[in-house]
Every structure is written in C-alpha cells, then in structure tokens.
C-alpha cells in the first residue's frame, strides 16, 4: 500500500525534496528508482459497446482493494497500482458489470473496456433518480423504466443539436413550443398550465405575466439534463396539466477537470452595420433603478427636487456605433477532495440583433388601416450565469448536496418608428427599453438509507428573483407631410416620458419524502412539502410637459440634448410630472401546505400500478389599492385532494403500454385575482384582475406505447391524450372608459386532445435520424356577457395544431477513437396559432406557420481541444402575422419581421 501511494505522487515528492533537501538528492534519487520498479499504470477508455459513446462516470476498481478511479468526459481513465496480477471490475449505471480476471499490470499498460447496456437492473428507477446524468443511453434507460411517462434530454444531446439554453432544449421535445414573450405552450395549453422546478424544487418567476421562469436564464453549460413529465404524479404540486419541467444542474462526479471555452459570432444582417443605442445607468450585474426617495417624497417636494438635481442621470440621446461580433465565454472547474466533490461553472456573453424594415398595423372591423408603423429595432442582450455545487458522500449510500445558482439576463432595445396614428397624424418615435431578469437560488438536499427497506430524501431551497425595467424612455415627434420637418408631438404630455418598474419575489421551499420497500419491488412513498412565496411590485411614470419649451429646430430623432436637457428642466421650460399612485404598487403572498401518499405495486412482474393521493392547502392573498386609493385585500383559500393513477404494462423486454389519469388544478396568478388597474410595462396592455376568479380543475387522461431497441438508442413512442378543462381561466377583453382592458374570467369549459409520435433510428453506424411530431385540437367557450371579443368559442391562445421536430446527425470517431466529428441538421416547423384574440368585430390575429433549420458541426481533437460551428435559422425565415377581417371576408397581414441567420464559432480547452 505504501509503495502504491508513493507511486501516485512520486513526482510531487521529488520536486519538494529537490527544493528543501538538496544535499540528500543522491539518496532520494536511488530511493525513487527502487520504488519505480514496483509501480504500474493502467490507462485506457470505457465506452458503450454498440455506440462507442464514452461512459463518463464509469468506475473501475481493483477487486478486494480500495483502489479505483472514474472515467472522465471522454471515457478515459488512469489507475496507479503496484505491478502484479489483478481482477478488475468495471461498472456504470444502466450497464452490465464487466469483470476481467488475471490482468497483469506493468508500467504504462493500456486496457480498453466495452460495456453492454442492462436495463433489467434498473426496474426500480424513479423519475427523480438520475438528475445528474448526461449520457443519452442511460437517460433512455431511465425513461424506459421510470414509473411514469417522461421525456428527457441530456447535456450530450443538447451539445449535438447546438442548444445553448433550456428554452431551446424544451422546444425540441414533442408537443412543446414557445410563443411570444417566452410563454411556454405544452399540448396547446399556455404558460399557466405548466410548472418548472430546479433539481426537483419549485422556482419562482420574475415575470408577473408568466407563471414559469424564463427558461433562457439557464445556459446549457450549467445543465446536466432536462426531464419533462406530461402526466401527473402526486409527489409534485398539482398545479400543472401541461408539463412538469425539471432542470437538473451539473454535479461533479468524475475526474478532476478545468476547462475554458470561448465563442464568437453574430447575425448576418447585423454584423458591421450601424447600431443605435441609448445611454444607461448601472451595469450587467446592477440595475440603474431610480432612488426610492424620489418616489416616496411628497409631490411638492419632488417638484422642487427635480429642478435642483438630475435624478435620472440619463438623457434621451441615441448614439451610434458599428455592430461588432458577439462574444461569450465559460469556465468550468471540478475537483474531488476525498468524499467531497466540488463543481464551479461560470459563463457570460452578449448578443446583438437588428430587426430592419419591420412593420405593425391595426385595422378597423371594415378592413381600413387604423394605424401603421414601420420600425427598426436594435437589440442587445447580456447574459451571465454561475453555478457552484458541493456534494459529500458518507456511510454506504448517504449523501448531501448543496448548489448555488445565479443567472441574469438583460435586454436593451432601441426602436425607431415611422408611421401614422389613429388620427392620421404622421409620427416618428424613439423608444428605449431595458429589461433585466435575475435569479439567485440556494438548495440543500440529502439522501439517507436505513437497512434495505427505508429511504429518506429531504430538500430545502431559498430563491430570489427579480424583474427590473429601469428608465424606459419615449419621445414622439410629429412629421410635416410636405416638408418632412420634425417637431415635438404635444398631444397630452404622455408622448415624452420615462417609466420605472421593479418586481422582487422570494420563495422558500421545504420538502421531505420517505420510501418503504416491501416485497421484491413494491414501494410505499409518503411525504410533505411547505412553500411560501412573497412578491413586491411597484412602478412609476414621469411625464414631460413641454408646453413652455421654445420650439426647437429638430434635424433627427437621435440628437435631443440641445432641448431635452436638465437646463430646461431647471429653468422651468420643461415640467416633469410624477405619476406614482398607490395603485402603482402591490404586495402578494402565497402559502402552500401539502402531503401525499402513493404506492408502487406489482401484482405480477410485468404490471406496475402507481396510485396516490395528494392534499394541498393554498392560502393566497394580494394587498393593493383600488382606483380610489383605498387599501384592499383579495384572498383565495382552497384545500383540495388530487388523486393520480399510473399503470405500466411491460410487453416482452422492450415494449410497454402506459395509462395515466389524474385530477389537477389551475390557480390564478397574483395580478389575476386583485381588481386594480395594472400595466407590467409602459405601452403594454392595461390589466385588471377579477376578485371573483376561482380555481380551474382539470381531468387528464394519457395512453402511451413505447418501443425501445435492445441493441442501440433506437426507439418509437406514440401517445394519445385528452384533457377536460373545467372552469378554465382565460384572458379576455372588456370595454372600460372607451378602451379595451384585459381581465380574467372563468370560462365555461374547454378541451385539449391530440396525438404525439416520437422516433429515433440509427440508419447505419454513427448516422442517426430523429423525428417527433404532434397534432392537437383545442377548444374553449368564453362567457357571452361583458366581453368585447369577437368569438365566444375558439382555440386556446398560443396553441398550434401541429408541431414537428426532425434532426439528422453523423458522429464518427476518427484517428483510432482519439477524435470525434459531429455534423447535424436540426429542423422545426410550428403551425399557425392565435397570437392575440380579436376584439370589436375583428377576428383573431394569428402567427403563420414558421419553419427553421439549424446546422451544427463540431470536432473533438484528442483529449483537450474541441471546436464548434453553429448556424441557426439557415432559411432566414420571416415571422408573419395575419388577422381575420370577417366583414370583408379576408385575412390581412398586420405584422412581419425577420430575425436573421446567426452563425457562431467556438472552442473549448480542457486541462
């Protein structure tokens, strides 16, 4: 043992002796030579026998000893042992153990191992059992043997398809698409019907209009895998009928590593072009919000203070630069200290995009153009994410995990508009918007086993999310139709303005689950969960009264500093009016108490019955001010029981038939249950909640057939589903003060049904086809009283009748397996869907069918270097919207823009 240990560190010891004991150099030289004669090294690779895919995390151990090691990301291992003859044991979850006896170990000996999959040993795999796995084969085995129907995507598949974040990843899963503003649509059901968790625990959303957190906050560099379940299981909260999306962050389990990566690229129609932007306070990590004292001080004091000091620190000037390439980079480090594993990862980047010659129109019910604006949009995105993970293993199978995840996405957009309003006035506009979303999440979890029957899993998390919109600015100019000269538009003092909005949300979660094994495979599960969420929102607008300002000579919309400046504010030529009413802020809280019990029962070996029940008590409240500035409180308290049944019948070794039925709930969001007038941002729709809103309840039925190949990753899956939506919550429009206001009502009923198909096929070695598609039908009946919407019955907003994803990949190993090349084409088609609901006699505004095609190429050179080239949207597709105008029996185009083709090249070096 002494010789083996000294062998593993002999170079380090030699270095220290040379520095501190130089006069004993000769003695130590001979000592090391003598030890060298007894040192042996085994190295090689551990791969999948069929696919040749490296098995990252596979273990190799010397039988009867504590000597062992773990394969790295390339499947490579190095094991230092004494020279001699041994028995080696190679293991990897989901594969048959390989035992090789009589291995004679000498210096620098290479031995390669090929493992065969063994799904029979994984019959008891649960959905939450492998959130730390990346390997596609093992994820397929997990999917095959899971108690409930799931779909998953690992880091390796995300890399192969050029997926940069979780949002792009879930769009490749059957029946899922992403609509405008990042809203997730699953089986035709909108954002409110799904839920998102991080490592199995709920996470809050910083977007008050969306239930789900923006999924592009999670870059692929920090993600181990994504698991999607479209059927309900009672171990989760019952507020989903669309999908439960769990994001598993990476955990260090393999060989120590340090990696550095960098990418450069850009959109073809943006690179090298003139790029316009506005000045900003703050930075990528810090938002330049207005000091709260200027909001809280009396109005008379504010009028004086705003003349004494420039409280904003920014101007309305728009500057110009040349669009340079986009840059991004990431750093990763993982190391094991005995039983303690540490992982650190960080990435940051920026993106720029120009939407040129886009337009948006509004029509009357008679088909006349009410208003129309052409616009150019200049968008800059800043993204940063960091992950720290600690895992500690003790006893035989107990462990503790801690993870800290931080992400921040900021979007800075300048838009110039040119057109006419509903009064026929020709206008030009300058609009600057900055929106930042952030997430800071802490998680601590543990797993403990007692004997062969009892198992305890516990977890806790505390998350903070934020949504800031600091200093949105607008200036509107009137354009003389004859001379094209510009002047400030002075209609009602709202044409030149600033807007500030802040939202902070905190969420605390505690979760305990216990499992008891009885019989050979049967299990009883029970547990409890506590969740508390708080939200604090406020916004303020500042309107510029320009009536006293001498008419300036205006040459363009960019150079405004000669007249829209602090000097004119100080001398009284410009009056700044603050709009910060009590109704501009609200506080909200939600408390959830839940308990569940379920059993996995095998009446006979091929039939699994999972039956369970969950109880949830939800107390939700919103403190707000009504239009008369009177303080109000809106509350919703419900205690409900949610049963679920999941049946799996295994036919032969690779076929299975699954059936699921459950009852779930759809709860109103905070802003939907409080009847105050609210705008999430300036220019967005006015929203008024409904104090009479109630929960909606859903009955979900799924039938699925799965076929998995015994030899490789080939598979086929087909699913039929039906959902009965009782009292569904729908966003509707009502007339208020001569204009449309969005509100929320319980509709009569709705349905969603469809079929999903998925397949993967290896045509020949290293050449693979993938395809998934869905066809769906949705229908909802709206209340006939009070609304100004044109149709009382329609498809669900955001639902496409069909979705298709396809990919072709070729991934051979070269140079004797040292190198690997990957070439892939990834295609997506999204059918037409309702973008906005038609009102005042107009039909629905629909986004037309959209096709996208991406190309991904990568090359791994030896142990250290890898290179990648990605081209997204090869078709340079145009996004188009058309609205039905029933009175003239026509469909008119109301908006169109072209995002542009994007290319990126990058490299990664692993030390």
Cite the ranges covered by each PLM segment.
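Surface-exposed extracellular loop regions of Gram-negative outer-membrane beta-barrel proteins
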Residues: 201-202, 410-412, 466-468, 487, ...
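Transmembrane beta-barrel wall of Gram-negative outer-membrane proteins
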Residues: 312-415, 438-444, 450-451, 645
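Outer membrane beta-barrel strand-and-loop segments of large Gram-negative receptors
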Residues: 491, 498-499, 503, 509-511, ...
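Short, acidic, small-residue-rich periplasmic hinge/interaction motif at the N-terminus
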Residues: 47, 59-61, 91-93, 106, ...
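C-terminal beta-signal and adjacent terminal beta-strands/loops
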Residues: 829-836, 858-911
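Periplasmic N-terminal accessory/gating domains of Gram-negative outer-membrane beta-barrel systems
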Residues: 132, 141-185, 200-234, 241
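Short, acidic Ser/Thr/Gly-rich low-complexity loop/linker segments typical of extracellular
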Residues: 65-76
